[in-house]
A protein has these predicted regions:
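Short, acidic loop-to-helix structural element flanking the phosphoryl-transfer center
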Residues: 6-38, 44, 48
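Cationic, low-complexity basic patches in intrinsically disordered or flexible, solvent-exposed regions
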Residues: 159, 165
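Short acidic-hydrophobic, aromatic-tinged amphipathic segments that line or gate anion-handling sites
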Residues: 64, 134-141
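Membrane-embedded alpha-helical bundles of multi-pass transporters/translocases
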Residues: 1-4
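Short beta->alpha linker loops
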Residues: 16-20, 42-43, 67, 100, ...
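Acidic, Mg2+-coordinating phosphoryl-transfer loop and its flanking beta/alpha structural elements
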Residues: 97-134
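Short amphipathic alpha-helix with an adjacent loop that forms part of the alpha/beta core around
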Residues: 142-155
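Substrate-recognition "cap/lid" segment bordering the active-site pocket of phosphatases
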Residues: 37, 42-96, 102-111
Length: 166
């Protein structure tokens, strides 16, 4: 943890908030039809530090981290289970996964959840190549986010590849 904090002091752009993320999470959680949970493939302590630096208090939302499961699918399922208890829901009518990495695309596909990507430039291109149909640049336009959360679709299965490498 000390190393992460030292790197952050040296480069203030590390772990910077994706524009609008903190206010979006709070606002979205006030919507009756949407509830927020945080799932991260990072270890709890480092993920909480990164969220804190980005202005997000992980304790405000149900959450799960790498400490909670060996796979990203299990981490996400654990976050959902915590959210069901936290929000007193037997099950959610719709779950949309939001992510910025290829592992997020794979996890959403494996769990058959609609997916909304977040990224610009090369990151956006990689998400789209991996199958993301909707990718936003950041969380600064709330109405845009709501539209894409509503429109997000379950990702198609990856095409089967032969065992040959080219």
């Amino acid at each position: 943890m000390k190393l992460l904090e030292d790197y952050r002091v040296q480069d203030s752009s590390l772990f910077a908030e994706i524009a609008g993320a903190s206010s979006m999470l709070k606002r979205l959680n006030q919507e009756p039809q949407w509830k927020v949970a945080i799932a991260s493939g990072g270890w709890r302590d480092s993920a909480i530090l990164k969220l804190k630096i980005a202005g997000i208090d992980a304790d405000d939302f149900p959450n799960a981290f790498a400490d909670d499961g060996p796979s990203r699918e299990e981490i996400l399922q654990w976050a959902i289970s915590k959210a069901e208890r936290f929000y007193r829901q037997n099950r959610f009518a719709r779950i949309v996964s939001i992510g910025d990495g290829l592992w997020d695309v794979r996890t959403a596909r494996n769990l058959e959840f609609p997916f909304l990507g977040i990224g610009v430039g090369d990151a956006e291109r990689k998400l789209r190549c991996a199958g993301a149909t909707h990718v936003i640049k950041d969380f600064s336009e709330y109405e845009n986010l709501i539209f894409y959360l509503t429109e997000a679709k379950v990702l198609q299965a990856e095409p089967h590849r032969s065992g040959k490498r080219r």
